[in-house]
Amino acid sequence: MTRYTEGNVALLPALAADLVRLNVDLIVVGGVRYVGVLAAKQATTTIPIVMESLATDPVAAGLVESLARPGGNITGFTIMTIEMAGKRLELFKAAVPTLGRVAVLSAAANPGNVLHAHAVQTAGQALGVTVQLWGVRGTEDFERVFAALRAERPDGLYMPGGPLTGTNEKRIVDFAVTSGFPLVRDSREAVEAGAFMSYAYDIVDQSRRLASYVDRILQGAKPADLPIQQPMKFELIINLKTAQALGLTIPPTLLFQADEVIR
């Protein structure tokens, strides 16, 4: 059985309570935000909870005792999206050697997005790239930010994932392409939609590992004893069609490194 918030996180406590009432054998919490896991944790201390793709440090968030031995009834997977911010920006710079200014477009009300944006800014200092932070507070705020970016003309855009940016994915990608901005994301779907490049965890590999954990728990393993795991495989995906539309020539060495090139 499945329960969805339809984008309304206020529904999470009721949805978690409903699953507990139904006495399910296990709860898998999807999505990158910790609030879903927190709602499940507050609803039950006995039903096993498996995190699918948490973007927050679960120890710092108070969800588990440690990565090696979570304790309690929660285990699962993180996606290291913030930790990979520097590598993502480094690859962006390798793809566009003239990259001097990057605008990070993120959800201002999303704590994970804010941390992610600051991680990109820190990485930029080491790479000689000026990183400008642009916070979007809601869907109605995009046009204001788009107009400002057209005036500022950064060399590229970087967008962390999240509910707000994900819901407006096509709108943002279309803006980037029509305005002449290469856009770097942390999801395959964004590049397939027309974004310039993505460097992110391999979702297929992560899903297989998630299924293995679910099976082990249903066979009797305790979540407290199963370490929190991080991604083992990452994918570099480049949209060559978008690069050509933007007039960019990707260095052959980087194309060779790519796991997938969309032509």
Question: Where do the PLM segments sit?
Answer:
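Short hydrophobic alpha-helices and adjacent helix-cap/hinge residues
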Residues: 1-263
